[in-house]
């Protein structure tokens, strides 16, 4: 290895790396700020202008886009015609490229960033050099990640060259890196133009964690997160205590966070298998948790609980009495954390709560991807319609609105029975609506008397209303829209139940 081209925006570790290369007899070629850093550190360096015999121009936009650089990178060492061609133009081969790119991701995440600032942080020369070097990995070593410095140096020191396997691995990493870089730029500019569903979608995610296994032990899995952080999400969670999250933990925690984000008042949400098993609302977070626990004392065991307020000592004492997989909250008081951290198997996570996340959700199908807007519609309650003779009381309306926030997060067909303070029965995932209703009503038992019922979609028949009436339900909220709405309304009138139509459906598959 005789020549290395180094041009980096992240200069961590680059000076000692270059010093080791010089000790190995490698000539260093560099540009701009990287060259200045080497000169300041006393590292011998050749400026890019000396190689290209052409000055940097356009405020640095053009400096390495030159045949003297790319010829030296792309020439196949095993092809005589290539080597003769570059020799004829006095171009020398470049054996090692160390490049990392302008910080586009970091730039667009800055508050108040302008489009001009974003565009100026789109790297052109860097990806070009990386791709040229990676294409010719048979002869050229290319490094885009500072984590690979030690591997490359060790091989050079021990063997005088890198192995083919290492060069191939690093080349693959480069193409992943440049593809992700371009995907993020495309996503950002697409957002700027306002296009919702462009003709091509290129997604990029960063691996956060290799998981022990997936949904089941025989399934391999990993957790990837979006480059642009979403604050109120499991991907932004900070783990304070406990062992690593599992695949199922992450999915359940995501579901719990979405429900908890629906409420401004203190709320506690218990989730099992991505469905809520108990939701409680209170004046304090302690009261909210107790309501969630009372909602289903059996199912909450081994579940995930999300709370939208700080977990204090009193709440922690209650929670420590049962086995919970995960507790998620904006924060834990010092005393609350100390109480819960005594349990080594519990996972404690903090997430900043900022309301429901707008944007898009993605669902994979074999051979494709479905993309839709998140179900984060801010509904105009003034457009809700009371269609029965009986009007809901103020307390009933409060309960209806609370359960309406919850039912949208239950797997369809979804029925939730509850009050303004808690869920009392949840029927999820049944193939017919009356089946879910009967489960929810049975779970609520005697507590159904005087409670309300929420349905994520319309009633195809009046049987759900009749079952609700016989259980003691006094008010119902549902989207409406069935050709048999009149029959359901008539059944509600027959039993003196109030019914509110929202005209908004919330299927969840």
UniProtKB/Swiss-Prot annotation:
Lineage start: Bacteria, Bacillati, Bacillota, Bacilli, Bacillales
Record gene name: purH
One Gene Ontology cellular component annotation held by this UniProt entry: cytosol
Annotated NCBIfam families: PRK00881.1, purH
Pathway membership, UniProt: Purine metabolism; IMP biosynthesis via de novo pathway; 5-formamido-1-(5-phospho-D-ribosyl)imidazole-4-carboxamide from 5-amino-1-(5-phospho-D-ribosyl)imidazole-4-carboxamide (10-formyl THF route): step 1/1; Purine metabolism; IMP biosynthesis via de novo pathway; IMP from 5-formamido-1-(5-phospho-D-ribosyl)imidazole-4-carboxamide: step 1/1
Enzyme Commission number: 2.1.2.3, 3.5.4.10
UniProt domain MGS-like: residue ranges: 1-144
Assigned keywords, A-Z: Hydrolase, Multifunctional enzyme, Purine biosynthesis, Transferase
Domain observations: The IMP cyclohydrolase activity resides in the N-terminal region.
UniProt cross-references to PANTHER family, sorted A to Z: BIFUNCTIONAL PURINE BIOSYNTHESIS PROTEIN ATIC (PTHR11692:SF0), BIFUNCTIONAL PURINE BIOSYNTHESIS PROTEIN PURH (PTHR11692)
Molecular-function GO term, any one: IMP cyclohydrolase activity
Pfam families: AICARFT_IMPCHas, MGS
Name the record gives this protein: Bifunctional purine biosynthesis protein PurH
Biological processes, Gene Ontology terms: 'de novo' IMP biosynthetic process
Family of the protein in this entry: Belongs to the PurH family.
Reactions the enzyme catalyzes: (6R)-10-formyltetrahydrofolate + 5-amino-1-(5-phospho-beta-D-ribosyl)imidazole-4-carboxamide = 5-formamido-1-(5-phospho-D-ribosyl)imidazole-4-carboxamide + (6S)-5,6,7,8-tetrahydrofolate; IMP + H2O = 5-formamido-1-(5-phospho-D-ribosyl)imidazole-4-carboxamide
């Amino acid at each position: 290895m005789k020549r290395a081209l180094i041009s980096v925006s992240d200069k961590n570790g680059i000076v000692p790396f270059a010093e080791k290369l010089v000790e190995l007899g490698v000539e260093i070629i560099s540009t701009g700020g990287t060259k200045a850093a080497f000169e300041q550190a006393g590292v011998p360096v050749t400026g890019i202008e000396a190689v290209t015999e052409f000055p940097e121009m356009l405020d640095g936009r053009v400096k390495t886009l030159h045949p003297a650089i790319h010829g030296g990178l792309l020439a196949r060492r095993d092809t005589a015609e290539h080597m003769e061609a570059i020799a004829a133009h006095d171009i020398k081969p470049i054996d090692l490229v160390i490049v990392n790119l302008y910080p586009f991701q970091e730039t667009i995440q800055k508050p108040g960033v302008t489009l001009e600032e974003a565009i100026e942080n789109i790297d052109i020369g860097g990806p070009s050099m990386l791709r040229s070097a990676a294409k010719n990995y048979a002869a050229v070593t290319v490094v885009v990640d500072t984590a690979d410095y030690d591997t490359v140096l060790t091989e050079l020191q021990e063997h005088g060259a890198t192995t083919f396997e290492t060069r191939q691995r690093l080349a693959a990493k480069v193409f992943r890196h440049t593809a992700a870089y371009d995907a993020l730029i495309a996503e950002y500019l697409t957002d700027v133009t306002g296009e919702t569903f462009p003709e091509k979608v290129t997604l990029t995610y960063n691996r956060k964690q290799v998981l022990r296994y997936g949904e089941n032990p025989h399934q391999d899995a990993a957790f990837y997160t979006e480059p642009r952080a979403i604050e109120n999400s499991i991907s932004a969670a900070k783990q304070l205590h406990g062992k690593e999250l599992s695949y199922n933990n992450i999915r359940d925690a995501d579901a719990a966070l979405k429900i908890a984000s629906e409420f401004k008042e203190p709320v506690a949400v218990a989730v099992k298998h991505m469905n809520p098993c108990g939701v409680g609302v209170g004046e304090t977070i302690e009261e909210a948790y107790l309501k969630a626990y009372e909602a289903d004392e059996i199912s909450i065991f081994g579940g995930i609980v999300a709370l939208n307020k700080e977990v204090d000592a009193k709440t922690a004492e209650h929670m420590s009495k049962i086995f919970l997989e995960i507790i998620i909250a904006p924060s834990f008081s010092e005393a609350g954390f100390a109480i819960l951290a005594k349990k080594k198997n519990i996972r404690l996570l903090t997430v900043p709560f900022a309301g429901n996340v707008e944007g898009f959700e993605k669902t994979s199908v074999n051979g494709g991807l479905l993309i839709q807007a998140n179900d984060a519609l801010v509904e105009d309650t003034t457009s809700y319609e009371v269609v029965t003779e009986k009007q809901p009381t103020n307390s009933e309306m409060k309960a209806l609105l609370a359960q309406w926030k919850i039912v949208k997060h239950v797997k369809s067909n979804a029925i939730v029975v509850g009050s303004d303070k808690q869920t009392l029965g949840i029927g999820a995932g049944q193939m017919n609506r009356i089946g879910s209703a009967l489960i929810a009503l049975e779970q609520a038992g005697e507590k159904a008397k005087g409670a309300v019922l929420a349905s994520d979609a319309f009633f195809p028949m009046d049987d759900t209303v009749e079952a609700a009436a016989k259980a003691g339900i006094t008010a119902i909220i549902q989207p409406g829209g069935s050709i048999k709405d009149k029959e359901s309304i008539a059944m509600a009138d027959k039993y003196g139940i109030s019914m509110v139509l929202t005209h908004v459906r919330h299927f969840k598959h």
